[in-house]
Amino acid sequence: MGFTGRRGKAEIIEAFSKHVSPYKAKFFSMVGIDFVPARREGVWYWDLDGRKLMDCHCNGGVFNLGHRHPEIVKTLVEALDELDIGNHHLISEQRARLAEKLAELMPGDISRTVFGVGGGEAIDFAIKLARGHTGRKKIIYAKGGYHGHTGFALAAGDEKYRKPFEPLAPGFVEVPFGDAEAVEKAVDDDTAAVLFETIPATLGMPLPPEDFYRRVREICDEKGCLMIMDEVQTGLGRTGKMWGIEHYKVVPDVIVTAKGLSGGVYPISATCFKEGLDDFMAENPFIHVSTFGGAELGCVVAEKVLEITSRESFLENVRKTGEALSEILGKLKDEYDFVDEIRQKGLFIGIKMVEEGWGPLLSISCYHSGILAVYANNDTSVMQFLPPLIVGEKEVDYIREKLAGAMEIASQRREMVEFIRKML
C-alpha cells in the first residue's frame, strides 16, 4: 500500500479538521475547495479523486524544480544509503561542500554560510549577525513584508502577523517599501541592519524603483549598518537570474535563501554573508546552533539543487518562458477590465487587479480552471503566479488556455468580490 489514498477524501478532511486545523478546513470549505493532494509529479498535482492541477503556487518556491524532480529524488535516495542528518556540533564534509558551492554562486564577496531549517530561522540568524557584529540594536524593515513566523523574523513582519503575539523583541522600525528617503530618515547610529525582501511576495510583488537598492546600499555604507536581502522567494533562478538582487547590480552584506533550496524533499535554509561579520562568534563558536539546520542529507540535496538551477540553460529557460507568459498576461490585461497591472521578473509574477478581493476570486477561478495559485495576503488585489521553473512550451500553452478560462470565470462572478472582502 502506498502513502496516499489510505482513506477516503471526506474521512481525511474530517481528521484534518479535528486534529490539525479546523480553521483551515473551514476556510477551504467556504471557498469550495476540497483538494487533497495525492500523486504529485513535475508541474502537476493530482487529488484523491484524480483531479489534476498545474502547481503555479509552488509553495512560494519550494517546488521551483517541480514535484519529485528525478535528479533530486535520485540524490536523496542514494544519500540515504550512506548519510543521516549528521551532528551540528562537528565538522561536516557535506556542510562544507554546500557552503563552498553557495560562495561560488553568491554575488560579490559573500563567502560564508550558517545553515538552518526554514526561512524564518535563517532570518533570525541574519538579525543576530547584524546585532552581534555591529553592537547596535535597530532593524529597519518594510511595511507589508513577511520574513517568517519565528521570533526576530516575526518582529520584522507586517502588523497582522505580529499583533496577536506582542510584546515582541524591541528595536524594529517600519518604512514603506521602495522609499529610499524613508530609509535614509530611519537609519541612525544605532541601526544594525536594513532588511528587505528583494521583491516582497506577500505584499503583492511590487517592483522597487530601479535605483532603490543602490540608494539603500549607499545609506548602509554611510551609516555602517548591514544590508540584508531576503531571497527566500526571489532566489535560485526564480527571476531569471540566480539571485533577484542581481537585477539591481548591488551586492548586499547578507543573503538569506530557503524554500527552493530543499528541492521540495528535505528542508534546509542558509544565511550567507561576507567574511568577518561573524566575528562575535570567535569567543563562543556554539552561541548559535541548529540541531537540524544543515542536515547532511539536506546538504546533499541542496548541492544538487544549486547544480541544476545555476545551469545557464536552466536560467535561459526561465527568461524565455517568462517572456512568453508576459505576452499572454499582457493580452489578458487588455481583454479584462479588472486587471490593472502585471508585475513580473522572470517567473516571479503578480497579477494586480483593480481592488482588494480580486486576488482570492481569481485564485478560486484558477482552481476551477485547473491551476493552483494563491493571492497575496497583504494585498488581496494581487494573485501570485509562480509556475515551476521547469515549465516549457507545452506548459505555457496549458497556462494560456486555463488562465484565460479563469479570467472569464472571475469576470462572470465579480459580484463575489465584496463578499470575499468581508470574509477576509
UniProtKB/Swiss-Prot annotation:
Organism: Archaeoglobus fulgidus (strain ATCC 49558 / DSM 4304 / JCM 9628 / NBRC 100126 / VC-16)
Keywords: Aminotransferase, Pyridoxal phosphate, Transferase
Family recorded in the similarity comment: Belongs to the class-III pyridoxal-phosphate-dependent aminotransferase family.
N6-(pyridoxal phosphate)lysine, modified sites: K259
GO MF entries: identical protein binding; pyridoxal phosphate binding; transaminase activity
Positions of disulphide bridges: none
InterPro entries in UniProt: Aminotrans_3, Aminotrans_3_PPA_site, Class-III_PLP-dep_AT, PyrdxlP-dep_Trfase, PyrdxlP-dep_Trfase_major, PyrdxlP-dep_Trfase_small
SUPFAM superfamilies documented for this protein: PLP-dependent transferases
Phylogenetic classification of the source organism: Archaea, Methanobacteriati, Methanobacteriota, Archaeoglobi, Archaeoglobales
PANTHER family assigned to the protein according to its UniProt record, in alphabetical order: ACETYLORNITHINE AMINOTRANSFERASE, MITOCHONDRIAL, AMINOTRANSFERASE CLASS III
Protein name (database record): Uncharacterized aminotransferase AF_1815
Enzyme's top EC category: transferase
Cofactor: pyridoxal 5'-phosphate
E.C. no: 2.6.1.-
Any Pfam family hit: Aminotran_3
Top-level lineage group: Archaea
